[in-house]
């Protein structure tokens, strides 16, 4: 089956691929999204923050050291010792956002719209008491204050984090996994 991506073609019967970031583009500016996906006029973008991808890589490497064996010390320290980094043969594919539409990667088709939604997971934890999975999304922040406030998910711009988590939980459930509605950032 040929992949249907980049530009929407109403005559193409294959599911149209939309990444998590493209969903956010639609939420921010539906007209810009339409121009991008139908007319090929690119949505304005920001340069990537290399610190974010480096943080993700370092945290994943740290979790890989105990994956499928035991909890990570930072989880234990924060009262989450019952959560263990999840080991699965497809995890490397699921964490590859650049190939999400390819066979076996992290996506699911929404049948009513024939849209293939996907992205790249940061990580997954398994609850050793319930067997449920918890989606993890690593976020980098800079708080230079002398008295930093705890990071939270309040604020309009953080709604995209919630949508991302909801989408990834939905996809994992569609892949047949028992997934807890609680995810971790």
Regions found by a protein language model. Name each.
Residues 1-132:
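Metal-dependent nuclease catalytic cores that hydrolyze phosphodiester bonds in DNA/RNA
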Residues 99-185:
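Mg2+/Mn2+-dependent nuclease catalytic core
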